[in-house]
Amino acid sequence: MGVRARPGREELDEPLAGLDGRRLVVCGTDADLAAVLLRLLRTGVLGAVPVGYVPSSATSTVARLWGLPRVPAVAASLALRGEPEQVPLVRDDAGGVLVGLGVVQPLDGVAYCDDEVVLRGQASRLEVVPDHALGLAVRVMRRGLLGCRAVRHAAGRAVQLGCVPTDVWRDGIADRTTDRWTWYRHTEDWQLLRRPP
């Protein structure tokens, strides 16, 4: 079944209702995968449907994070024949999900990862990715004479920030300008088809 980029409720809810636990393969961008997982979450079948992913870009953060093949034919084979493994789903306080890379940039404010202060002041960017162990990992970047470099790393269940208005990006898509944002690990993992049969 073909759908538009970043499909929504009107395109997905009916086909997803008929899956009955069968595998679902998403071919597209990290943002497309996030849109499908959001619908699985909202229809209550997130943990019941194994999801395969064939990234349309060799630079997919999801493929890099979870060791998925970047060659489409190999990725499709794994998506169709692979075994599922639970991986964390990261949500945000605006009702979205993050499956690859979240970016806030530029940043002037305070950010916490769980109860640890990871930023107080200015940074070029703050990056968040899902993390198998705790739920998410955060990296604070500052620009110096030699370019951007990571100055702080942390992992935890949530990252919260308050700042002067800045831009938030989810999985390569500009989301909004805001002065506060939260990403957190959802209570239920999703089933990624990533282990060879």
At which residue positions do the language-model features occur?
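Catalytic core of DAGKc-family lipid kinases
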Residues: 2-20, 28-34, 38-39, 43-170
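Extended, charged low-complexity segments
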Residues: 164-197
